[in-house]
Amino acid sequence: ASGEELFKSKPCGACHSVQAKLVGPALKDVAAKNAGVDGAADVLAGHIKNGSTGVWGAMPMPPNPVTEEEAKTLAEWVLTLK
């Protein structure tokens, strides 16, 4: 599945949209923050799969039911967004 398909089929949309901040940051802002950062896709994939805290403020991101491969596909897709 493509990153966009995974975004739509997983619970991502409950907290994120591409263009606007919801509970979590807009995905275009995640892409902008990580533009040109070495290893950004791997770090982001880890956040998608395992969750994270304190990256975008107080709201934690929960772990998500995705495989390593799905997390990587999602991360790579997010990083292409503008």
Swiss-Prot record:
Keyword set, alphabetical order = Electron transport, Heme, Iron, Metal-binding, Transport
Question: What is a single Pfam family found in this protein's UniProt entry?
Answer: Cytochrom_C
PTM info: Binds 1 heme c group covalently per subunit.
Where is heme c annotated to bind? C12, C15, H16, M61
Give this protein's Gene Ontology molecular function annotations: electron transfer activity; heme binding; iron ion binding
Role played: This is a prokaryotic monoheme cytochrome, unreactive with mitochondrial cytochrome C oxidase or reductase. It functions in nitrite and nitrate respiration in Pseudomonas, but it is also found in other bacteria.
**Name of the protein in question:** Cytochrome c-551
| Organism of origin | Ectopseudomonas mendocina (Pseudomonas mendocina)
Query: What is this organism's lineage?
Result: Bacteria, Pseudomonadati, Pseudomonadota, Gammaproteobacteria, Pseudomonadales
